[in-house]
Amino acid sequence: MDNYSSLRIGGKQFSSRLMVGTGKYKSTQDMVESLSNSDTEIITVAVRRIKNDQTGDNLLEKINWKKYWMLPNTAGCVNADEAVRIAMLGRELAKLSGQEENNFVKLEVIPDKKYLLPDPIETVKAAEVLIKKGFAVLPYINADPILAKRLEELGCSTVMPLGSPIGSGQGLLNLSNIAIIIENAKVPVIIDAGIGVPSEASQAMELGADGVLINSAIAQAKNPPLMAQAINYGVKAGRQAFLAGRIKKQDFAIASSPEKNISI
């Protein structure tokens, strides 16, 4: 990506590089205000949450789907077959929201209940099937450069390496691998999971990531709408810093004031 304002995924263009999740908020009002403050255009929706919702507080009815692009996710799936089934349901949910041509899916296959780390083998299997079914697949993966390239070659629309475990707020723990993924990728790289504060979102963008996806850092903040706004600023600042280009690191000091031709 060569400018801030253009993020292209699956043939669709977005002006924001911040994706936001819809889970874990204390109230629907917090969620709606946070989405607005974030300036996001893509929001993730857990298909299982919608499918099993018995409260009457239907997420599909709370969000303006003319403003936001739905990214259904397969959270809760433990194998490829299950993920494919949930992805199909997600596509139907998108149609119900009025997005008839929405084939996006955030692919999550997570059998590990303690650390919530994605299964690379089942993720590849599910991605192969979903791509053949016409989905724009956005796979959630460990920060593994080889796996990221393999999924890109399969036809995934992005790769989404984790910064650190979901909801941990530990930030970017594997900078070297994330940097390699960014360097090698020919599809957008979206950093997903573990970001806790705006400075970490900015750091991801400064590395050259094309975007970030954030949920817990916003939803579980003391003031979610304010945190959403702060992270929005962090993402924009990080992207601009990447485009501007940082100075080279040196092992010694270099004076910023001229030392010659100064009359005293």
Curated annotation (Swiss-Prot):
Organism: Prochlorococcus marinus (strain MIT 9312)
Catalytic site positions: 106
HAMAP family according to UniProt: ThiG
Transmembrane segments: none
Primary role: Catalyzes the rearrangement of 1-deoxy-D-xylulose 5-phosphate (DXP) to produce the thiazole phosphate moiety of thiamine. Sulfur is provided by the thiocarboxylate moiety of the carrier protein ThiS. In vitro, sulfur can be provided by H(2)S.
Positions that bind 1-deoxy-D-xylulose 5-phosphate: 167, 193-194, 215-216
UniProt superkingdom: Bacteria
GO biological process: one example: thiamine diphosphate biosynthetic process
Keyword flag Nuclease: no
Family of the protein in this entry: Belongs to the ThiG family.
GO molecular function annotations of the record: thiazole synthase activity
A cellular component term, taken from the record's GO annotations: cytoplasm
Record pathway: Cofactor biosynthesis; thiamine diphosphate biosynthesis
Subcellular location: Cytoplasm
Subunit structure: Homotetramer. Forms heterodimers with either ThiH or ThiS.
Substrates-to-products reaction catalysed: [ThiS sulfur-carrier protein]-C-terminal-Gly-aminoethanethioate + 2-iminoacetate + 1-deoxy-D-xylulose 5-phosphate = [ThiS sulfur-carrier protein]-C-terminal Gly-Gly + 2-[(2R,5Z)-2-carboxy-4-methylthiazol-5(2H)-ylidene]ethyl phosphate + 2 H2O + H(+)
Protein name: Thiazole synthase
